[in-house]
Amino acid sequence: MEKTLETVPLERKKREKEQFRKLFIGGLSFETTEESLRNYYEQWGKLTDCVVMRDPASKRSRGFGFVTFSSMAEVDAAMAARPHSIDGRVVEPKRAVAREESGKPGAHVTVKKLFVGGIKEDTEEHHLRDYFEEYGKIDTIEIITDRQSGKKRGFGFVTFDDHDPVDKIVLQKHHTINGHNAEVRKALSRQEMQEVQSSRSGRGGNFGFGDSRGGGGNFGPGPGSNFRGGSDGYGSGRGFGDGYNGYGGGPGGGNFGGSPGYGGGRGGYGGGGPGYGNQGGGYGGGYDNYGGGNYGSGNYNDFGNYNQQPSNYGPMKSGNFGGSRNMGGPYGGGNYGPGGSGGSGGYGGRSRY
C-alpha cells in the first residue's frame, strides 16, 4: 500500500506534461512584473515557472506572459476562478498552445464550439454528453446526419458555455467515445475562418512573419513583419503568441506558420488532418455556416470512411508566411526582435530573446 501511495504522484507527474500545466496570460499591465504575476497565480497552486515576455531591446513588457503550475488540477482551478485582475487590470488567461499546434491556422482562436469526428452509427447524443460534460457545461450537442438517408455522417458538434473546455479538450487530443477513437478540434465558423485568413494574409505585413528568408527561417525579417497592434500592442487584440518554451500565444489570429489544410476562402474546418474526405463538398456542406474544410479523401485511421468525394474547398494559401515554425531559443521564441516598425510587440528582426 505504501508503495502505491508513493508511485501514484510520480505517475501523475509523468502524465501531466508541461503543455497541460501552462497558461498564457494576455492583457497584462506594462507595470506587471514576474513577481506580481507569480504572487497572483500562486493562490491556485505552486508555480514551476513564471515569465513576463519583454522586448529584447527596450526590456519593456510586451503585455503578456506565461505561468506554469505543478499540476493540471491547479490550472483548472485558476481557470474556474476567472475573471482575473492583476495590478488593476483584467487579464486574459488561456491554456497555452504547444509548439507543434501553434503553427496551424486557427490554433489561437477562442471558440466555444467543438468539432467531433469519428462518430459511429452506434454513437448517440448521450454518449457525447456523458463524455464531454466532465469538461464543462454543455449548451448544445449536434450529430450531423445525411438529409436523404438519415444516416450519421460521422461527425458532430458540442457547444459549451465557455471557451476553456474546448481549449482543454483540444489540448489533450486523444479521446475515446463509446469505444471509438474520436478526433476533436475547434469548430471555426465561416466568419472566423475568414478572420484567420485575413490575419494570415498579412494585412500589409502585420501578423505576417515575413518570408522565411532570414534568421534561419525563424519567423523571417520580411518587410512589415512587425506584429504592430493597437494601444495594447497585441495586433489589435489578435494573436498574442510568442511561443515561450515552444508555446504559442493567446486568443485570436491563428497567425502562426503556413501549414495548409484549412478550408478555402469560404471557410471550413481546416486542421490539416488528413483522411476526412467530404460528402457534398465538405463537412456539413456549409452546415450552420461551418463550410467544408480540406480534410483530403480516404479513411482517417479507424474513424470511418469519409471518402465520398474530395472537398471542393482548397487549402488556404499561406500568403507571405514562410511556414517555418522553428521557435528556437531558451524561451522557444526564435528571432523576435523589434521588427520593422516595432510598435510594442514587433516580431521579425534578428535579436534573440
Curated annotation (Swiss-Prot):
Region Disordered, annotated ranges: 193-353
Motif Nuclear localization signal in this chain: 9-15
Entries under SMART domains matching the protein: RRM
Residues modified to Phosphotyrosine: Y331, Y347
Comp. bias regions, Gly residues: 202-223, 320-353
GO MF annotation: an example: miRNA binding
Domain RRM as annotated: residue spans: 21-104, 112-191
Regions crossing the membrane: none
UniProt modified residues of type Dimethylated arginine: R203, R213
Residues bearing the modification Omega-N-methylarginine: R38, R203, R213, R228, R238, R266, R325, R350
Modified sites of kind N6,N6-dimethyllysine: K104
GO CC terms, sorted: catalytic step 2 spliceosome; cytoplasm; extracellular exosome; nucleoplasm; nucleus; ribonucleoprotein complex
Modified residues (N6-acetyllysine): K168, K173
Recorded domain comment: The disordered region, when incubated at high concentration, is able to polymerize into labile, amyloid-like fibers and form cross-beta polymerization structures, probably driving the formation of hydrogels. In contrast to irreversible, pathogenic amyloids, the fibers polymerized from LC regions disassemble upon dilution. A number of evidence suggests that formation of cross-beta structures by LC regions mediate the formation of RNA granules, liquid-like droplets, and hydrogels.
Protein function: Heterogeneous nuclear ribonucleoprotein (hnRNP) that associates with nascent pre-mRNAs, packaging them into hnRNP particles. The hnRNP particle arrangement on nascent hnRNA is non-random and sequence-dependent and serves to condense and stabilize the transcripts and minimize tangling and knotting. Packaging plays a role in various processes such as transcription, pre-mRNA processing, RNA nuclear export, subcellular location, mRNA translation and stability of mature mRNAs. Forms hnRNP particles with at least 20 other different hnRNP and heterogeneous nuclear RNA in the nucleus.
Binding partners and assembly: Identified in the spliceosome C complex. Identified in a IGF2BP1-dependent mRNP granule complex containing untranslated mRNAs. Interacts with IGF2BP1. Interacts with C9orf72. Interacts with DGCR8. Interacts with TARDBP. Interacts with CKAP5. Interacts with PPIA/CYPA. Interacts (via C-terminus) with FAM76B; the interaction results in retention of HNRNPA2B1 in the nucleus and inhibition of the NF-kappa-B-mediated inflammatory pathway.
Name of the molecule in the record: Heterogeneous nuclear ribonucleoproteins A2/B1
Lineage: Eukaryota, Metazoa, Chordata, Craniata, Vertebrata
